[in-house]
């Protein structure tokens, strides 16, 4: 399968160190050799690089590795194709507009039958099941709210929709609007939060060490999420399948386990003329999938501090 990398920080931070470890897995230390991509948020803007070449041999990847683009939210992906041809249009992450913000999505896994789920205005450019799932997810959010809701209900709804998609197979997801970084674990995902006192770390995939005490200030908070831990001498938190952690300004929110609230009709359709909140569906909006809310069992709050 593919591999994911995400970052959330409270100050603009470069991801060169973690990205150096990830791209080695794109055809050198692992077989994810069917393209790669990375997206950096700079204010409301989103700067993205994609290449269908293996990241370990990509000149574009080497440029990104050596150019310290500073961002508070980053999403990256290296691909091992299983749905859709190897091509630029099928490289993650994918980006679309919702509520006046650029939303970015990357996925690891396979989703059987997701292309039978109907879509509205959002349409895939490529042929992956991942991009179809992204379009479907954004349509459900757009159908429910005219503008971005507050953080807590948005977290619950993203988690519920991710759990519905996870019913179709393997669904590990990074999703962001540049403010929140939603990380859903279907099978494998790990994260680490770095904050003062900072220390050194060494990559698993390359003999490269960074001393974060020389690269940060005492107030910095940086969280990194990856399919597999990227460093060998730090303690990473391995997520439980079916759980989601949301990061804001580098700080992990309470981890929650999600399951879809409805079991009827996995096509993503509602009954005619109904919205998920029970009211009439707005004219011209895409259909919704599921009934109000979701069932979420809370786990203990995650501990802050250097890991």
Where are these regions (language model features)?
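A conserved acidic, glycine/proline-rich C-terminal tail/linker
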Residues: 200-243
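Glycine-rich phosphate-binding loop plus the immediately following alpha-helix
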Residues: 113-115, 119-144
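Structured interaction and signal-relay segments at domain junctions
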Residues: 35-72, 76-81, 185-188
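Conserved beta-strand-loop-short alpha-helix elements that form
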Residues: 2, 103-113
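Short acidic (Asp/Glu) patches
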Residues: 52-64, 78-100, 117-120
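Compositionally biased, low-complexity flexible segments
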Residues: 272, 277-292
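Extreme N-terminus nucleophile/cap motif
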Residues: 1-59, 201, 243-246, 252-265, ...
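Catalytic core of PPM/PP2C metal-dependent serine/threonine phosphatase domains
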Residues: 73, 147-187
